Structure formats: structure tokens, C-alpha cells
């Protein structure tokens, strides 16, 4: 109450920000006449003048009024579009590194031009990030002529481009592309084999379009580059056969093999389920008599079993995925689009493939990964724009340090948002939706129906066919036609069913898209035909406006109010009339899981009967409270994911920095020599403990260790017999000299140049190989870390501590393996070095995943998360090696001093 009173007196923070930015807009407006009088040449010359002023230590902020005035004038001349004041407001907010919330149809594409132009002047590059390839291509081609007129180059990053074209696109002043492509290019650059192969420059400034979709909806799904791991696809098929025999436990303590936690989107085997699983495994010969599913040797089976169970119980065809061309293709829950080439990780995708009877592709091992949260925080300056960000303002501020500024609309909003209508059953709800659609269709009012899944859109389509209502369906199966269908969704009486936010970024114009119709005539069409099309379009436009504009129907509430607002925002653009209504039932996911008791109680109190709908502010408020609860829950998960990924991010930063330094270095011989001294010192200390007496020395073991690990044959026992004065320090020096001598001989044979090249190639190969193994170990650690909570330990602290220990061990292994490789491999010519390079490239046959993220407490994942079961740890083949027995690797050392140390 006090806050409301203060904001009435002093204005909200948003009002105060807008007041200060409006002063700058007034300065831009004051320059409009002056710049309109300039010739094209004079206007174009401004770009070089601005760059000279920047070189003379003027700041970008000082250039805002003139630079924005130049872009506005260029927009009028090149595109025939003048930036409105609110668009300039948005541009200044973007330049300030904030998020501009602008309603649908307010021209966000044009808003970005002024901020992109200004920030491209220093020559460090600007990235404009969109949600799909179509929008990146469209926006770059649409705005490209404006930038070109002002002397700036434009590049586009598309998914099918070769590295040369990518590099050229990144060297442009302004580069358009999707979030996935920018993220994958960053990871690919950090797997490159030379600096010349890297395509990206330093990450300077990014404008993220649909920022809520990219930085919030997709924040829990990391980008992963992976390579094939050894895994039997036959096992997935064998285990898949058992799944129909398992029964769900319907009530607590009742019969059944598994329970489902819908809130957490998890499935758990009951005690009876464990016994049943073991029984079917025994019958099929996958387990032996007397074995348990939890024996170390059967952990792999358990991993496959859990993946198969989740595939059958939690993942549904035409909701979470579709089957197309003998492949399981994931459907993006936020956009309803298919994601070809993307795969769920950790065996889940293979289990779904087995369930659907398609070809099973091999399981993958992570080679590189990053979350969008950490990728976008690498930019020196970040800004974003969207139609719906205010509900998530707290998260943007907390995680990205981005403030949301709500920009007023150019024309007043006249859309009517009707209250929710709630029914008892889904059947009644669909019947009411069909009646509403028929009414609008009869009156010539266009309708857009938003659904949460392909299944719902196809069900509604079936009902409309029965009623003989002509309509178009836009979902993941038909997104090739997406822009065309959406562009014409505003024609009189048109009925369009769209999954979620498909077609985002394309405006629905009342009366249909005039530009699209004119384009069908071709460039040489006569004037009369064009005039006829314009006249017909105007008639249609007037008819739609008279019928009430575009009517939006929501078939259920999404977990996030923001996604609902996005659907509403398709109507009422630029002051157009329009209306929206959501139809709900107590059988909807959100209502059933999060709000059913409260709402059904309300309905009973209000005396509701079957077939009746309830429309009441209390109900709407109760639903929004349920949504707030889910949003808070999802925010906690994303925050938790970030806290865990920050640990990996620090390590990733160190490794990538080391890689870049290695690739940039001409000569790494000093580094190799320093590493060699440390590695030999550690090895000698295993057999000759520092400060020990000679009776404690294990000379045969040391000789064997040097020979097996580094190929160095030395007679240390002979040295000691010949020189009784040899003590620990001098012995270390003699061994070091012998190592240096052997290495020097190798260098003499091939020459210094080949050796330097080989050292660099070997270091990069070992670094990449060990980093890949480390990522797998980090995955294993993260999967089980939440169990530490049962031991009264803080899982986050334990994860940080153990991840650091793993990282230290990896660094030691890198040093050891580099020296072992350099010492043992025979190099004769440059061709041998090329062979090492070839091996590294072969090991990098990769696949790109935007896979389901795993959080610490997967048990608290949200309704639509796709967290994967834990990976199977390494399972020993054969008998256990005793700690004092020789290590099976052949080093000659005791197991406890060799590979036993890693355990």
C-alpha cells in the first residue's frame, strides 16, 4: 500500500526512466529537420565522422542524438519507414543494456536498427539474436539495405553454412543469427585446431529478440556438442519389451510397479516393481540367479531400465515428440516446433526410439557444453526486446543484471480481454470453444486458437471438420508453411489453430497480408490489377474491424503467465480492435496438478453444475496464483542450474583460455620442459619418498615405471653401485638429465621445427581428450550429488569441493599424459605430426544437442522439464585388482600407486 502511494506521488521507476529517456528523444526530434535537408552523400558521411569522434575519445552516449537521427532519416529514405518516438525510446533502452518490453506490432525489428548502428561504430561487431533461421534471414534482408546505405556490412549465420562463410558473417559490422547458432559457434571455436579455424570475434554487444524465450524458457536446456560413446542398442530393445508388463500404482500402498510424480515429471519403481524388474531380467537372461538390480555389475541395466520406464510413462507421441522418417524428432514445448538433430541425452532418446520401433542411434558423450545463461553473460554488453518480459523482471535482474523497461504503445490499446471460462470437463470446454469459433466464423471475424500441444490442435481440427468449419492447422508438423499461414490469419472468417507460439515474429494483419498478395502478381503486374487487390484487401480489412478484429482463443493456461500474454498479444496490434478469451477445464494439466482443489472448492461454493461455465474474477485470480507458484518453482530450478553450471563455467573458462594460449603460441617447448620436470619429480617421489633413507627406496619399481610410462631405459641400480655418494637430490637430477638427453636425441633426428609442431599438437590432443573425460565425470558427480543431503551435507558445497578436486586431478593427468605421449611416440617427419592432428579431428565427429538439462534436485523438476536419468558409471569387467598387486596397465607399479589412486 505504501509502495503504491509512493509511486503515485513520485512515479514508478519505469516512469522515471522513461522521463529521462524522453529528454534524449526530444534532442533527436530537434535534429530531424536539419538531417532531412542533407543530401544522401552528406548523410552517409556521418558514419565516418562518428568513428573519427569515437577515436578522439568521445563516448557512444554523446553520439546518441545524432546517430539515432541519422538512422531515422536513413530509414525514411531507404525503407520508407520513419522511427516513431516510442521506437527511439526502445532503441535508447537497448543501447543502455536493458530489456525493452514492447507490444506485438510495435516494430521491434526497426527498433533494433538504431542501437545496432550506434554500437557497430567502434568496429567490434553487433550480434542480433533471433529465435529461428527464418526470422534471422528475414530481418537481415529487410534491414540490410538501411545498414548498407550508412556504410555498415550485414552478415547472417544460418545452420547449414560452412566455416568460411560463417567467419565472413562474423566479420560483418552487424550479424543476424539464432541463439543456437551463436552458442554452438562459441563451443566449436573452443574445439578448433588452430586460431585460423575460429569463426567468432570477441563477444561485444548482443541484442536478443524475444529475450524471454531465449534467456528464460530455454535457460534450463544447455547446448551440447557430443560424440558417439560405446553403447549397445540391442539392450534398449530387450528392455523395451518388458515395459507393457509393468503396472502403475494408482494409490499409496496399493498394488503396482511404479509411481508417477507429475509435478516433478519423474517416475519411481516401487518395492514390488524392483522385484518384478529383477524377475523379468532373470527370465530374459540379462541377469544371473542370485544377482540384484543394484549390484555394481548391473548399474548399466538399471540405467537402461529407468530410461525405458520414463520413455513409456512420461514422454508421449505428438506431445513431446513426433515420429518422422524413421526418427524420433523432439517437439519444443515452448514454440511447438520440431527440433531436428536435437536429442535427449543419457539414453532417454534411445529408449524412446526403442518404444516407437524406429532405428536406435548410438548414445552420446559430451564433448563441450554451455547453458544460454552463461553464454550470454560472456558479452561485454547485453540487451533484449520482447512483448512480454515484465512478469519475469525479477529473474532478468537477478541472473543477468538486466532491467526491464516497459515502453508505451504508439497508439492506445483497445483490445478486450474477457475473463476465463472454466468448465468441469475437457469435453465441455472443447464444445464451448467450437461454438465460439462457429459464431466468429459466421460473423466474418478471424480466429486464432492457441493450443499447448500437437495432440490438442489435431483434436480441435477433428471437431471442426465434423462441424464442416474450414480452418488451417499450424503446428510442429507443418512449420514450413508457418509464416504464410500466420500472415493470412487475419482474413475475414479465417480460423487458424496454432501450437503455442508458433509463427512468433510474424504480425497478423487484419484483412490478411497485402504485401504477400501483391508479391504473387510478380514485379511486372499492371497497375489496374494491383489497385484491384488493394481495393479488395481494404474491403476485407474494414469487414474484420467491423466484426471486432482478431479473436484469440486459449485452450488452456500455460505454466507461465508470460506465454499466455504472448498469445493474447497476437491481437490488438497498433491500436487495432481485438478480443481474447481462455477456455479451461479442471482436467487441464495446470489446473489438475496445481490448482484443482482450490478451484473445485470455489466451483462447489458457487453452485456450478455439469455443462455450465464459470467466469469470475476469483477464479482468474486463483489460476494466476497457481501460475505464480509454478513460475517461482521454475525460477528456483533455473537459478539452481546456474549455480551448478557456474562451477563448470569457471573450469570451462580456464580450459578454453589455456587452449587459446596454446593455439596462439609459436613455441611451447619451455612449457613442455617445465611440465616434464614436475611429472618426473612426482614419479620419482612415488618410489623414493622425499626425505627417506635409501632402504625405503624402490629402485626396480622406479626403473620399470620410467621405462613403461616414458620409454626411458636407465640403470639406476648401476648408478648407485658406481657412485655411493649419490643421494636423493642428485639422483633426481641424473634422471632428469637422462630424460632431457633422450628427448634431445629425438629432436635432433626430426629437427626443431617438426618437434615444436608436434609438441603443440600433442598438448592440444591430450587437453581435449582429458576435458571430454572430465565432463563425463562432472555429469556423474552432478547426477548423484543431491543424495548428500541425506547425510546432512550441503549438496552445492559438496559439488563445488568435489568438482574442484576432479579438476585438479584432470590437470595432473594432462601433464602426465603430455609427457608420456611426447616421450613414447616416434616422430620421424611432418607426416607423423599430421597423423596426430588427424586423430584429433576423427575424435571430434560431433552431433549438436539442445538437450534436457539436469538439475541437482531432478526430483523437483517442473511439469515440462525433460531431465534425464543418471548415466551408468564405469563397471569393472573381470575380478577386482588388489591394492598391492601390480597395476593391470603394465606400468610395473603397485595398483594403489598407479590407477588405484584415481579411485
Swiss-Prot record:
Species assigned in the record: Nitrosococcus oceani (strain ATCC 19707 / BCRC 17464 / JCM 30415 / NCIMB 11848 / C-107)
Domain of life: Bacteria
UniProt protein name: Protein translocase subunit SecA
Compositional bias (Basic and acidic residues): 874-883
Membrane topology summary: Peripheral membrane protein
Listed HAMAP family: SecA
Cofactor: Zn(2+)
Cofactor annotation remark: May bind 1 zinc ion per subunit.
